[in-house]
Amino acid sequence: ASLHGIENICALTGDDVTAGDETEARRVFDLDGPQLIRVATTLARGEYLSGRKLDPAPHLFIGAVENPSAPPFEYRIQRVAKKVTAGAKFLQLQISYHPDRLEKFCKGIVELGLNKLIAIIPTIVLIKGVRPLKFMNEKVPGIDVPQEVIDRVEKSNNQSEEAYLQTLEFAQHALSLPGVRGLHVTDFRHDETLERLMSDLG
């Protein structure tokens, strides 16, 4: 990746093969998330895992992922600590439709002082209506969408606008949390909404 000018690396285990198209693919568990981060960190220091020198060393800015809303919640913070120790510099979070859980997660990171070592980047998803909310709730591992979030959009006379306003509220709340330094925005709308969000967020 470094040879092609790619310096930002987000290291993650990923979903189980049963969540993809090739459900009978072989699972590979040689490395977990923190171990993969440690491999990248070692390479960036100019060494292979064997200790042999790597010259020139790749320039890598290494990140990790975590789900702030999935139990067990205390374990999630412990995993972040392991990833920071392994060398992660940014933490991209799974989309959370539970502001209270996201806030508790971020405060837990700050209480351990990890926010001084890693940038927290929550995910925000721009959608046009209720269908993506139901899809994520039913089909995407690790995502739990509260019924009140679904109902607010579904019962609106203008689902597209209500979905946007709700997303804006989630984004504003996320940016107000301690340790948060930005947002990862996924845009399923493919219109001018992303520009509107950036403008509304200031």
Q: What is the predicted role of each segment?
A:
Residues 5-7, 57-60, 88-89, 114-118, ...:
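Short, well-ordered coil/turn segments that N-cap beta-strands
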Residues 2-17:
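A generic, well-ordered mixed alpha/beta core segment in the N-terminal half of proteins
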Residues 14, 27-55, 65-70, 112-170, ...:
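Active-site pocket-lining/capping segments in soluble small-molecule metabolic enzymes
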Residues 89-98, 182-187:
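Catalytic beta/alpha-barrel core
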Residues 177, 185-202:
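C-terminal/domain-terminus segments
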Residues 1, 83, 87, 122, ...:
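Conserved, mostly hydrophobic/aromatic
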Residues 21-22, 73-75, 103-104, 131-140, ...:
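Short, well-ordered secondary-structure micro-motifs
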Residues 72-83, 164-174:
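Short, acidic/polar
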